[in-house]
Amino acid sequence: MRDLEIRGAGNVLGPEQSGHMMSVGYDLYLKLLEEAVQEEKGETPKPRVDCAAELLISANLPADYVADAGQRVDLYRRIALIRTDEQRSDMLDELIDRFGEPPAEAIALLDIALLRAKASEQGIAEIKQQDGRLLLTFSETDFARLSSLCGDSEFKGRLLLNAGSTPYLSLRLNKGEKAMEMAQTLVDKYAATAK
């Protein structure tokens, strides 16, 4: 994949394909390419849900950590593309190699990027911290999976399903619990209900 990023894809799907990568950007190009390949195989591309995460934590690349604004923009773009634990780990290694030990805000940025990716895969449209609670809103509601999650002993008595016009889960945070860690736990446990 890195070779493709460096050298370019060339004429992958036909004579008119060459040269379009530069006009749409590499990331969008890969997405369009993946959709075209799925279409050629007769598969229906799964619509991607982009999860919004609003947690009350500081998550950024401080200017005193990455001084060059252009490098920061590039890193923000690349961090937003994190989809797996391995990609998060690789990005953390790169930050350490290039800029030294990252501050807590940079670690939080990596964690949020991975959380958003995992939540998006599960159809979670939004994760929000509000009034001592975590609220999870879903693009599609699977009541069997949500009921299974609500029955988890770790959340007993504090995870509620609001089945209104826009169903959502509400988890009351206990004193001392970190919203980020609990959001990760909720998303991981919700993913496990699909298996």
How would you name each of these model-derived features?
Residues 1-195:
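Accessory helical-bundle/CTD segments and flexible terminal tails appended to RecA-like ATPase motors
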